[in-house]
Amino acid sequence: MKLTRLLLFLAGCGLASAAQPNIVFILADDMGWNDPAFAGNCFIETPHLDRLAREGVVFSAACASAPNCAPTRACLLTGQYPPRHGVYTVVDDRHAPGSPHHRLLAAESREALPAESVTLAEALRPKGYATAIFGMWNLGRGRTGPSTPVGQGFDVFVEPKQLGFEKDAYRDARGAYSPDVLTDAALKWVDTVKDRPFFLYLPFHDVHAPFDPKPELLEKYRGRPGTPDPALAATVEAMDRNVGRVLATLERLGLKEKTYVVFTSDNGGTRQYVAPLRGGKGTLYQGGLRVPALIRGPGLRPGVSNATTLSMDWFPTLLELTGTPTPEVDGRSLVPLLRDPAATLRRDVFWHFPCYIGGGGPCSAIRSGDWKLIEFFEGGRTELYDLSADPGELRDLASAEPKRAAELLAKLRAWQTSTGAPRPVEPNPAYDPKAEPNRGRENRGKGPKNPK
């Protein structure tokens, strides 16, 4: 199956040429929708991201394809919804189906990206692209095999562990800062492939907690009145500096005008940082889904698009921009929005999270226009929101708009059926109420009372 799909790519691909654009895809970890200054943050300085925003297209309503890291990474690399590839969450003992603190038997999640998946890197290689990932893969373990980066189309894979960093650590034994070292390695690689088209995937660990910020930046924000969290602010600015280093290298090598630079995050931020949105990472409320997103590159009309976009849309978008044949995928190309940011993108979009993680339980959601419906599998209840009037999702209109709620639920169920999405409705026989952690009322589909 995979060989057949790759042969189809080869049949439609010509030889690489100097005119083929490069791609630099920078992915933040847990960066909330309003952490960068270009998204409205008044406390954190992100001059390099702000420059990208001025020179490119910003997607002001961008959402992750999933509320946590692994599935979103699978979606952006394959252009598919989670039920297609089966990656729903990070697989570890805390979230294993049948855990005593789960009311329902959660769906099984793949630990690795299916070997038959065709990734963005695999699609680009027949066009003569050099491909590399420097950072977190999170879609399978090991360095060789069909589900590793090398098995999924990347010529080079450098993870923090290879550079002397423990898992999720910002610093090594010498005190070196992981994002800086990864950026050093990535830019050295760019120097070696500068004379051919390349795809650089740079998934940073920042801004995932717990933070270990640079002292001078931490001191800067501690001395700035009103900064909500100096450690987060310092970590965001440190990441922005590395973005600046990438941009400076592209300019030094004369590659700015032939390179698309994408920046986004894998999911929404933690709930204390996403106000006025509700929820956070691990939930299907807007706080868990909204992410910063932008692209700069040749032929784009700078501006702001208000269309609802998903992580999986980057796959067909970047293939179209590089003239690469695109297989049938769930994502939609955003190229029309890059030519005219005021253009519309009409479609229903879906999310499916049949697992437990942190504060979030199994649920599924649909957005159709301004309306969003969430189905919570615990208790079998739904919530309905008009995001145009209530972006914070405080007023559940399911009872006031029963017809609309029923129509959206029918669409959601039809989509679940068409994609083979698992519906975790079976009670967990091992459930122990005393073992249940305090997950918060809103993540069980029991949100706060509507304001008077």
Predicted segments — roles?
Residues 19-21, 28, 32-33, 58, ...:
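Long, internal low-complexity/basic segments
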Residues 19-24, 55-60, 127-132, 152-155, ...:
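Loop/turn elements at helix/coil->beta-strand transitions in domains of secreted/extracellular proteins
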Residues 21-32, 51-52, 76-78, 124, ...:
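Beta-strand elements within well-structured catalytic alpha/beta cores of enzymes
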Residues 41-74, 79-84, 130-132, 155-157, ...:
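Short, structured active-site-proximal loop/turn typified by the sulfatase FGly-forming signature C/S-X-P-X-R
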Residues 41-46, 61-68, 107-118, 172-182, ...:
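A short beta-strand-to-alpha-helix junction
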Residues 44, 144-153, 211-213, 248-300, ...:
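Histidine-centered active-site microenvironments of extracellular/periplasmic hydrolases
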Residues 89-130, 137-200, 204-216, 222-225, ...:
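Formylglycine-dependent
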Residues 268-284, 300-301, 307-387, 418-422, ...:
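C-terminal cap/loop subdomain of S1 sulfatases and analogous C-terminal strand-loop tails that border
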